């Protein structure tokens, strides 16, 4: 079937340019959304009397027939059409004859594709939110089992203070919750209908934009037709939000990679989620977190590509917009695959080495801050206490011992405020339990955090 504009041109399009210009191989992914938007548009044309009710009904039946053919694999991306819109229109004309040519009345591909993308992305945001909730629940399950499991806490990748493993894991629940909140905010801006803006200036026909918006469950319509067809802010926002999801997944991946190394040995990778080496038989490689860490760069790249693509575009529609779809599509696939792979890894692929974690928090100076706090409780100014503890640590390092190994005379020589109870204050359990500030790693505080998360997920079920 010839192109709609062929009567305007004297010669056909160069074959390579035709292929270069086509987008059907990737925008066919929007078929269901294109059919949904077209059905809403056909109903509106019938409601407003632009076409009669019988014609509107026949158009809807034809569009549903195409949907059926697609589900059977008969109607697919192997169409001699530039894009999904023309593929649908061509097939509709084959099914209905001249009536099929009426579907595009009062509509342009410009507002059509803008509508399709929003419908598709709205659904994908919900799917990603589900994936995020799932990984949160898996992390929460680990946290519930490890309230009293202690792990070294780090700053600058140097041991700093011991923390509850549950507290550490709950930090990622917080990150993923912010990701979910951002997606909800993005969805609120995705959920605005551009349908009816036509090419850029609206239409002279008496269309009803509010009706089509309601049919497609949009919450509002664009108030400026130029903005409606040229706005891709929502796509940038979505990929930016997705980039932060990948940042958080990458940070978690980095920790799992460290933890599974011989140098840390905080976790063991199970055979279900690890691979081996082709030459080194002893190896068990953390491929899943490494891949997730690597894939974050893809999403960051899509964000940069979209920003650069948009920055110099005049109003309204430009063919450059064709480049937004592959960035969006691949972002969704990458984020969902990464979330699902990490969820499987967390649920089935790693085991915490409790003995190793226990020995790790007993073998360093991460209790030094508590010695300073002890002196502060004895009315020693903090900065003076800090300096005293610094000298104690230096003494221990010189003698090759830990703070707990100092004799009581050595404590007293450093400051008379030290009493026998200093030894109890040095135990990792006491160090962690003493963190009573809201949001801290103290067992009571983490227990409250666990309860808050449990209540949050329970309320979602109701």
Curated annotation (Swiss-Prot):
PROSITE patterns (alphabetical): FUMARATE_LYASES
A GO molecular function held by the record: argininosuccinate lyase activity
Keyword Cytoplasm part of the UniProt annotation: yes
Enzyme Commission number(s): 4.3.2.1
EC class (word): lyase
Chief location bin: cytoplasm
Keyword Ribonucleoprotein set for record: no
Record's catalysed reaction(s): 2-(N(omega)-L-arginino)succinate = fumarate + L-arginine
HAMAP family in the cross-refs: Arg_succ_lyase
Protein name listed in UniProt: Argininosuccinate lyase
Primary gene name: argH
């Amino acid at each position: 079937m010839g192109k709609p504009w062929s009567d305007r041109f004297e010669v056909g399009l160069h074959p390579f340019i035709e292929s270069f210009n086509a987008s059907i191989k990737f925008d066919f992914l929007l078929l269901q959304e294109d059919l949904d938007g077209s059905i809403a548009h056909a109903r509106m044309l019938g409601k407003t009397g632009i076409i009669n009710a019988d014609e509107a009904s026949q158009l809807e039946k034809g569009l549903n027939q195409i949907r059926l053919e697609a589900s059977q694999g008969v109607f697919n991306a192997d169409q001699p059409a530039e894009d999904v819109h023309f593929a649908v229109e061509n097939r509709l004309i084959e099914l209905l004859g001249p009536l099929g040519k009426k579907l595009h009345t009062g509509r342009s591909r410009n507002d059509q594709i803008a509508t399709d993308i929003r419908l598709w992305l709205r659904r994908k945001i919900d799917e990603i939110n589900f994936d995020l909730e799932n990984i949160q629940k898996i992390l929460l399950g680990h946290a519930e089992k490890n309230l009293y499991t202690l792990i070294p806490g780090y700053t600058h990748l140097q041991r700093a203070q011991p923390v509850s493993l549950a507290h550490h894991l709950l930090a990622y629940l917080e990150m993923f919750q912010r990701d979910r909140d951002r997606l909800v905010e993005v969805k609120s801006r995705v959920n605005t209908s551009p349908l009816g803006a036509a090419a850029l200036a609206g239409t002279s026909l008496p269309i009803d934009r509010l009706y089509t918006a309601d049919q497609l469950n949009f919450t509002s319509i664009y108030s400026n037709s130029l903005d409606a067809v040229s706005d891709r802010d929502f796509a940038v926002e979505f990929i930016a939000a997705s980039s932060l999801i990948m940042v958080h997944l990458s940070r978690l991946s980095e920790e799992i990679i460290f933890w599974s190394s011989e140098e840390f040995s905080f976790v063991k990778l199970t055979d279900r989620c690890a691979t081996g080496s082709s030459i080194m038989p002893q190896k068990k490689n953390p491929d899943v977190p490494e891949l997730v860490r690597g894939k974050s760069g893809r999403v960051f790249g899509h964000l940069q590509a979209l920003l650069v693509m948009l920055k110099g575009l005049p109003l309204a529609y430009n063919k450059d917009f064709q480049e937004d779809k592959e960035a969006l599509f691949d972002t969704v696939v990458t984020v969902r695959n990464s979330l699902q792979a990490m969820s499987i890894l967390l649920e089935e692929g790693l085991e915490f080495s409790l003995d190793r974690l226990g020995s790790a928090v007993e073998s360093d100076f991460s209790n030094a801050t508590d010695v300073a706090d002890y002196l502060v409780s004895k009315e020693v100014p903090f900065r003076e206490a800090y300096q005293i503890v610094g000298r104690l640590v230096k003494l221990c390092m010189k003698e090759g011992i830990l703070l707990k190994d100092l004799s009581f005379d050595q404590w007293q020589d450093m400051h008379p405020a030290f009493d026998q109870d200093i030894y109890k204050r040095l135990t990792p359990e006491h160090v962690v339990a003493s963190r009573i500030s809201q949001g801290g790693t103290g067992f009571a505080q983490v227990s409250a955090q666990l309860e808050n998360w449990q209540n949050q997920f329970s309320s979602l079920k109701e």
